[in-house]
A protein has these predicted regions:
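Extracytosolic ligand-binding ectodomains
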Residues: 1-428
Length: 428
């Protein structure tokens, strides 16, 4: 059990700056407020005060009450790393989208716990700094700058925000960033220190367009999206181009989910009267409410298609039977590695999402690189070398040395009715 005498070493990770920055936490700040209790809050207060023995006991007690809380698992692991651990950061939208944040953190927490229980990386355990950027570009840049300035941080997992605004900061600062969730195309040209574990937007839209036109036989498709979400706009534009390239037609309608007093019924009527026999709908992951109006008014009249954003438990829970047949292109599905999915579900007491598994693999990739070269530049060089190959939960992992993109293809899934309700199932 860690003693009070290690507090100065842990505090030194970000001291004195991190203690004053509530967005960066090794355990001294509560970031995920929706999955908390008074015991966890007392544990975090104890860490901030240097009473790590008390904090460890309180975190264990909190996890007995809330075993699916990854933030607590990470903070508990951090208390048990001893001296001279490797330190990485993970950046999540802790306040604006705590569900997505926890999906990412569960993957990182599982990988951290696993490697530390095995004795660490060449004898050095792994400490994880949790960072909140709320998917906001300006905050992303600010926390990225702070992480770059800290020489102890050797790699970053994130950001979830799709605009890649922080990538140039990591590139300039020589700090490896590996995105486990963002399909943004501009990550492919962001520099040598930027990597991506999921398929690019180009690959995702190409695969989905091929299914829409050639498999689902949708000749005319209409589009609903949030014009205030840059990732929505770029995904919509790329999918439109790919659909047209494959011989499909775009039905022009006014269906902007971001406008005040959005009228879903008018948009659906316009699409149907225009001859659409398919509908693509997508929204910002933090602003899904208008989507359910579209889904409700559609009443399964038009087959639905969407981006990876819709591989989300809320789509199933709030969409119900009206989302049956929804087809989405995603990086991963549990059926591709059912044994691993079952283990993760047992650990976290909830279904495993693709974000959890890609974040687990992102952490495993960093761990593998650190075994061979435990420096910022050396880690980047190893992953970029062209002969880095791993087989992890999501399958074979290697990176294009020119772009940093993972080599591989997305998976098509569709909502089907099952005895336990609507579920996403993979398409053959």
């Amino acid at each position: 059990m860690i003693g009070w005498f290690l507090f100065p070493q842990i505090l030194a990770i970000f001291a004195p700056k991190a203690d004053n920055n509530p967005s960066i936490s090794y355990g001294n700040h509560l970031l995920i407020k929706t999955n908390s209790n008074t015991t966890k809050e007392s544990a975090i207060a104890a860490i901030a005060q240097g009473d790590h023995q008390e904090a460890e006991q309180l975190l264990q007690k909190s996890l007995a009450q809330r075993p699916n809380d990854p933030e607590s698992v990470i903070y508990l692991s951090n208390l048990q790393t001893g001296s001279n651990p490797f330190k990485i950061a993970v950046v999540v939208p802790a306040t604006t989208n705590p569900n997505v944040a926890q999906e990412i953190l569960r993957g990182v927490a599982s990988a951290q716990t696993q490697i530390n229980q095995q004795g660490g990386i060449n004898g050095r355990k792994l400490m994880v700094i949790v960072v909140n950027d709320d998917n906001q570009p300006q905050i992303s840049k600010e926390v990225a700058s702070e992480l770059v300035k800290n020489p102890d941080i050797i790699a970053v997992i994130g950001h979830n925000a799709p605009d890649a605004s922080a990538a140039p900061i990591y590139e300039k600062g020589g700090l490896l960033m590996i995105s486990s969730t963002s399909p943004a195309n501009n990550l492919s040209s962001a520099g040598n220190y930027i990597f991506r574990l999921v398929a690019s937007k180009s690959n995702i839209t190409e695969k989905l367009a091929n299914y829409i036109v050639n498999t689902a036989k949708v000749q005319k498709i209409a589009f609903c999206y949030d014009s205030q979400a840059p990732d929505n706009v770029s995904f919509k534009d790329e999918l439109m181009a790919n659909v047209a390239k494959k011989g499909g037609q775009i039905v022009p309608i006014v269906c902007d989910l971001s406008v005040p007093n959005f009228k879903a019924d008018q948009a659906l009527n316009q699409a149907i009267s225009g001859g659409a026999n398919g509908l693509f709908v997508v929204a910002h992951v933090d602003r899904l409410d208008p989507v359910f109006e579209v889904i409700r008014f559609n009443r399964q009249r038009l087959p639905l298609f969407s981006s990876p954003t819709f591989y989300n438990i809320r789509i199933l829970e709030d969409g119900g039977k009206n989302v049956q047949g929804l087809t989405v292109a995603v990086p991963w599905h549990p059926s591709l590695n059912q044994t691993f999915a079952n283990l993760m579900q047992e650990q976290w007491r909830s279904p495993v999402s693709w974000r959890t598994v890609t974040s687990f693999d992102a952490t495993r990739v960093i761990i593998a690189g650190l075994r061979e070269n435990p420096q910022r530049h050396g880690l980047q060089f190893r992953l970029r070398s062209g002969n880095f190959h791993r087989t992890e939960a999501t399958g074979k992992i290697s990176f294009d040395p020119n772009t940093g993109d993972r080599i591989g293809q997305p998976v098509l899934i569709q909502v089907r009715s099952t005895p336990s309700g609507e579920q996403f199932v993979p398409l053959p």
